[in-house]
């Protein structure tokens, strides 16, 4: 059973992050950062309450900082989360969610 799912937008975010990271710091750093994000998704799925509630943005959403990014997610069931977006911390979240 999957513990987390990525929205279409989150998948696009992840591809953009991977492309930027590789072009700036190389494949090894890209692989490391994507692995760290994947580990963060798993941690959030296992402990969905660890993120900061952000109902002021969207009802039921939580956010969790990871390095230069903020992971936005919500619980789907008692056993899974949906990663909604992975946005750079400098972005305007309201316009992206």
Where are these regions (language model features)?
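Conserved N-terminal glycine/acidic-rich loop preference
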Residues: 9-16, 49, 71, 93
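Enriched for short, Lys/Arg-rich terminal
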Residues: 74-97
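Arg/Lys-rich, positively charged N-terminal/basic patches that mediate binding to nucleic acids
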Residues: 1-34
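Basic/aromatic recognition patch in beta-strand/loop cores that engages polyanionic ligands
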Residues: 49-78
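Short proline/glycine- and basic residue-enriched helix-capping loop/turn segments at helix->loop/beta transitions
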Residues: 45-46
């Amino acid at each position: 059973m999957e513990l987390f799912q990525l929205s279409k937008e989150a998948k696009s975010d992840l591809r953009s992050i991977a492309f930027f990271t590789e072009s700036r710091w190389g494949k090894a750093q890209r692989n490391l950062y994507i692995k760290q994000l994947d580990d963060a998704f798993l941690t959030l799925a296992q402990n969905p309450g660890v993120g900061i509630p952000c109902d002021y943005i969207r009802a039921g959403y939580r956010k969790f900082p990871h390095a230069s990014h903020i992971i936005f997610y919500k619980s789907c069931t008692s056993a899974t989360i949906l990663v909604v977006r992975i946005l750079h911390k400098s972005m305007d979240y309201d316009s992206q969610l």
